[in-house]
Amino acid sequence: AVRSCVAAYRDEVAFLADQPLLMRSYNRLDVDRLHETATEKSLRAEIHRAARRARHRTSDRALPRFTRELHGRRQIVEEPPLITHLMRSEQDAVAEALDDYLGTLASHWRRVVGGYTIVDIAHKVVGVGSVGLRAYVVLLEGSSPDDVLFLQLKQARRSVLAPYVHGESAWHAHQGQRVVEYQQALQTVSDPLLGWTTVGDLQYYVRQFRNMKGTIPLDAIDAAALTDYAGVVGHLLAKGHARTSGASMIAGYFGKSDNLEQAMCRFASAYANQTEVDHAAFVTAVRAGRLPIEPGALESSGSAFRP
């Protein structure tokens, strides 16, 4: 899978390095082409299912799942500790921050979003990659009760790579702006409502909470499909990197040999071995009582912690 990913990345970067900058920006891989690119039947089936699920991930579809009507007014449903409402002072701070967010949008979208009114705000715990960071979800209503929009504010901090690129100086004064601008640079089509704002002394980027985003569950595909999938990932990553105008430099670094592919395969193998060692140490610590866990967590997860 690693070799497939790196080889696809190398080939696509080499191709795009010879293309005009504008063509690189327009070059895209839509669902139909992605389906054609996949050689494994099982992966093509998962792509089809992921696309179908993504088309249903919209604000209006989320309305009955995440809200309820109380005294004639829509409210976000609490699911403690994952979704909780805010104190009035924090609600006011988020609402004020959304006013500032409007100024980061293109004029057309500023008018569109400005036509919506805030109905409810809640704090929402998000994925593993954002553990320890704050995130809000905001329900807004437009011209009718069925005309709804969910926005998500996610805290943004300075990249862990920044010290190695910019030293102690910050290339962007606002880290939410950094996330938005880099996402727009890497993606052919980004969320048009991407923007940034500040709540208190914390910086955030803002996006649609439900914007037809989809993913392929890796535990649903076999080894052959995983290898195929890794090649698609490498292909797409190359497109994103090429849009930043660095394709020629990257292609030159790869050269004509497979030395980099071999090096990354060795690294991946070593990393996999280390992961198994780390996991074994983690399991030992849990079983010995040195690390606390939530009661019942292991029984419901099909975990390797079970004896």
Across the structure, where does each feature detected by a protein language model lie?
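Conserved ATP-binding subdomain of kinase catalytic cores across diverse folds
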Residues: 1-59, 96-307
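Acidic/Ser/Thr-rich, low-complexity mid-to-C-terminal regulatory regions of eukaryotic proteins
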Residues: 46-83
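Ordered core of a single globular domain
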Residues: 68-117
